[in-house]
A protein has these predicted regions:
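Conserved SAM-binding strand-loop segment of SAM-dependent methyltransferases
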Residues: 67-74
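Glycine- and charged-residue-rich phosphate/anionic-cofactor binding loop of Rossmann-like
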Residues: 41, 342-359
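C-terminal lid/capping helical subdomain adjacent to the catalytic/cofactor pocket in oxidative enzymes
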Residues: 357, 374-382
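Contiguous beta-strand/loop segments that form the cofactor/metal-binding neighborhood of enzyme cores
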Residues: 2, 8, 12, 178, ...
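Predominantly a Rossmann-like dinucleotide-binding segment in NAD(P)-dependent oxidoreductases
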Residues: 22, 133-136, 143-237, 373
């Protein structure tokens, strides 16, 4: 019988040896991010393009790292290498699950870009492979490392909001180009949600909003999502032009709202709200923290300054470290540094294979719910 990987502790790694698969825009940006991360060494690079492989080598050189000997167009060579501990997967959406499972079968830990999978079948495949191999399957969901979210999570875990009732999350980002009827054709989301996308509706990009909400609600850590209902305001339009709304309910009776909107002229927002019997906190559109006992809410820059100067998150040291290093994006740095820290110390990861599967499963389930026009049950991957 397979063992759970929810709190998996793998042997500590003195130096994490990394294979990076996928050296397009996302992969090259990942290499650039890792110039700030200690305790790692890149031992394999994989891409179909020889030009991308050379560009990646130059990025490593500019960041003071050695060129990689194993630079190949064949991912299987990298996965089979005994010089690899962790495989970073930055390829197209459709290959994430297959590459992740192949890496775990070879005994490698995996960190993959969002989403982890597009279908329920592949979500289950990730979970079963992680359990059988006892390897980490980490989802690179950087919004779970937003300093604001980390401080919100610390206050939830500290009981500041009383009994939780409701959470909201989203990815609201106007990506339309000069032609208001479509996204710019060179934008990544245009391709990811294009002709090969397997579903006609639903929320195709759920993890930025759902991941932080799941952590706040303690999903798989005391509660679980049980049902989902999805609808779209403009179902006749192409997927990138719709407004998707998903409502979820948990076993303990809490609710969650998840939205995706890539086309309307709304300001950027991930909502990031939590409601409890004793308080409320939200990042967008204006940061606000309200406790029942307070006469006045703490808002805007005053709240952000409070969170910066009196942090309560156990991950605050990573945020401070990123600030001190002057990293371009402290959210990404915190995610990367925390992942490597846990692998080097033999600690459980913050995001498990079960989380990666559940957050990604909403893609297919929301599409089915929207099409069938009724709620659906969510599987418990744990």
């Amino acid at each position: 019988m397979s063992q759970s990987v929810l709190h998996l502790r793998a042997p500590a790694l003195e130096c994490v040896r990394i294979a990076l698969i996928g050296l397009g825009s996302r992969g090259q940006k990942t290499l650039e991010r890792y110039r700030y991360i200690d305790g790692v060494r890149f031992t394999a690079l994989v891409d179909h393009s020889l030009e991308h492989l050379e560009e990646a080598q130059l990025i490593l050189e500019r960041s003071g790292r050695e060129r990689v000997v194993l630079a190949t167009q064949d991912s299987q060579l990298a996965l089979a290498s005994d010089e690899v501990d962790l495989v970073l997967i930055c390829t197209d959406w459709y290959s994430h699950a297959t590459l992740a499972c192949a890496a775990m079968e070879q005994g490698r830990h995996v960190a993959l870009e969002v989403p982890a999978a597009l279908t329920l079948e592949d979500c289950w495949r990730l979970v079963h492979t992680a359990e059988r191999t006892q390897r980490h399957c980490f989802l690179l969901e950087n919004c779970c490392y937003d300093p604001f979210h980390l401080e919100m999570l610390a206050r939830v875990e500290g009981g500041d909001f009383g009994e939780l009732k409701h959470a909201e999350g989203a990815y609201i980002h106007n990506l339309q180009g000069q032609d208001p009827t479509e996204l710019p054709r060179d934008h990544q989301l245009y391709h990811w949600m294009g002709e090969c996308y397997p579903f006609a509706g639903g929320n195709a990009y759920p993890t930025h909003g759902l991941g932080p909400m799941a952590q706040l609600l303690g999903i798989y850590r005391g509660d679980r999502f049980t049902s989902l209902y999805a609808c779209a305001s403009t179902p006749g339009l192409p997927l990138t032009q719709r407004h998707s709304t998903v409502l979820l309910q948990t076993e303990r009776g809490r609710t969650a709202l998840l939205q995706l909107d890539l086309h309307s002229p709304r300001p950027y927002s991930r909502l990031q709200s939590i409601v409890g019997t004793e308080g409320y906190m939200s990042k967008y559109p204006l940061p606000i923290l309200q406790q029942r006992a307070w006469a006045q809410a703490l808002t805007g820059e005053a709240l952000l300054e409070e969170l910066r100067t009196r942090p309560r998150s156990p991950l605050a040291s990573f945020v401070a470290e990123g600030d001190a290093k002057g990293v371009p994006n402290v959210m990404n740095y915190t995610m990367d540094a925390r992942l490597i820290h846990c692998l080097r110390e033999g600690l459980p990861l913050d995001i498990s294979a079960y989380d990666a599967a559940l957050w990604s499963a909403v893609i297919e389930l929301s599409a089915r719910s929207e099409q069938e026009q009724h709620p659906l049950s969510l599987p418990s991957f744990l």
